[in-house]
Amino acid sequence: MISGIRVNDNCVTEFNNMKIRKTCGWIIFVIQNCEIIIHSKGASTTLTELVQSIDKNNEIQCAYVVFDAVSKIHFFMYARESSNSRDRMTYASSKQAILKKIEGVNVLTSVIESAQDVADLK
């Protein structure tokens, strides 16, 4: 927790529910008031569709996303191209805090800025 940002316990609970009980297909985490919290979660979709929906939501500038791709759980930091560098640095320096709390991530991608980045992964 180098950045001073702590992970809300609900993040771990919901991640474990997604991983074990398959209660949702994805979770978006954001930093609010020096704490990582759940912004939203939803049913299964494709990774491209998920990132496209984040792209359309102007409320989200930066976030952490976990995505259950059936056989693997993906984790990535989302940072809109237009997001300010301070937010990007805060999210980058706090990433290890959440990764230490949520166990079972199989695929770790550094930063995704748009749906096009997901297409480039394939």
UniProtKB/Swiss-Prot annotation:
Q: Where is this protein localized, as stated in its record? A: Cytoplasm; Cytoplasm, Cytoskeleton
SUPFAM superfamilies, A to Z: Actin depolymerizing proteins (SSF55753)
Q: Is the keyword Membrane in the record?
A: no
Q: Where is the signal peptide?
A: none
- Biological-process GO terms, alphabetical: actin cytoskeleton organization; actin filament depolymerization; cytoplasmic actin-based contraction involved in cell motility
- Gene Ontology terms, MF aspect: actin monomer binding
What's the chief localization of this chain?
cytoplasm
Q: Which UniProt keywords apply?
A: Actin-binding, Cytoplasm, Cytoskeleton
One Pfam annotation reads Cofilin_ADF
| GO CC terms of this entry | actin cytoskeleton; cytoplasm
Q: Where is the ADF-H domain?
A: 4-122
Subunit (UniProt): Interacts with monomeric actin, does not bind to actin polymers.
- Function of the molecule: Not involved in actin polymerisation, instead functions to stimulate nucleotide exchange on monomeric actin and influence turnover of the small amount of cytosolic actin microfilaments. Essential for erythrocytic schizogony.
Q: Which family does it belong to?
A: Belongs to the actin-binding proteins ADF family.
User: What is this protein identified as?
Assistant: Cofilin/actin-depolymerizing factor homolog 1
